[in-house]
Amino acid sequence: MYFLKRFLELVPIFFAISIIIFVIMNSMPGDPLLQMRMQNPRAMTNDPERMKELREYYHLDDPLPVKYFTWLKSVLTGDLGYSSMYKSPVIDLIASRLPNTLVLTITAWLIGLVFALPIGIISAVKKYSTFDYATTIFAFIGISLPGFWFALIAIIIFSVNLGWFPVSGMATYGITGFWNIFSDRVRHLVLPAFVLGLVQVASWVRYIRTSLLEVLDQDYVRTAYAKGVPDRKVIIKHALKNAMIPIITIIALDIPYFFGGALIIETVFSWPGMGRLMYNAVISSDYNLAISCLMFLAIITLISNLVADFLYVMVDPRIRMGRKGA
């Protein structure tokens, strides 16, 4: 019941976000039909009657509320419209690009978690040590510099100079055999996934360190140390478990960041995913595709909230019991 309630609370938020995105996209300058004519002048007619029919077909002259509900009805039935840039149904484009982005973002998220968690814990336990100072410097540098800068540096060092990884793309054409294809995909994945994941490590390390330090200063942790409980057990069983709630908040709610960050990383590495698709849709004023991509990001954000709630309850069941008693 708790998760059902949380899910139902997100439904009106979803519709509110859809209204905001739809209004913003429809407030942008430009005429979709004019854009379609510029992209494919041979396929578009100059006949005024035909243009009028097309405007009626796409509901371009309808009042904004009518346009919104017409669009919403189509979306809820699985019709996301037609891409004027790719000359293909939007839902087919998303279906073909989404798996590529999921592979990239999930790998990057796991890389970020694998690096940030131990570094943050060690930095908190060894407070004011050389390791802690070095970690702090690294974190501030990582937070200050943009992701595309790291991407370009990584390409120059590991692709151009060392030749360890491909410069761009997701696969090398002409390769046959399962293991050859698999290893080739991994080589293409390593660089963009590490760049996307390690950029986020900087901020995660700071949150993990701060959260764990607050718990390590609590009386019950000092009591455990005074009773002779081994350091590893105190940190993992007592301190880290109670420090996990704010850490979960950041790590779970940063999932949309990876999809947003993929927009830049996929563009730099020419990775054929949702980020690059969204970038191309925006710069080419492909309204149907741009709106659908933005709605996809909104859905990912809402799902991240549900994931965070689920992890909260796993770490501390009292959260669910507290909500029931409220």
Feature roles, as predicted:
Residues 59-117:
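An internal, D/E-rich "acidic patch" concept
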